[in-house]
Amino acid sequence: MTDKKTVKVKLVRSPIGTKESHRATVRGLGLRQIGSERVLEDTPAVRGMINKVSYLVQVL
C-alpha cells in the first residue's frame, strides 16, 4: 500500500463549444459526461490539466 496523494475531480459543465484542446484535456482526465467523477493521482501534470479546464470541472 502506497500513500500517494489523490484528487477527486467532477465534470460540472459540458465541453461542447469549447476549444478542441480543452475537450481533449477533459477526456485525458477520464471524464465523459456531466456528473462523472474520477479519483486521480495528485501530480503536477494532473494539476495543470485541472487548471486548464477549471471552468468545466470541480475539485471535490
Curated annotation (Swiss-Prot):
Transmembrane segments: none
GO molecular function: structural constituent of ribosome
Keyword match Protease: no
Biological processes per GO annotation: translation
Alphabetized Pfam families for the sequence: Ribosomal_L30
Record keywords: Ribonucleoprotein, Ribosomal protein
Domain of life: Bacteria
Ribonucleoprotein is among the record's keywords: yes
GO CC term, one of those recorded: cytosolic large ribosomal subunit
SUPFAM superfamilies the UniProt entry points to: Ribosomal protein L30p/L7e (SSF55129)
Membership in a protein family: Belongs to the universal ribosomal protein uL30 family.
Subunit structure: Part of the 50S ribosomal subunit.
Protein name: Large ribosomal subunit protein uL30
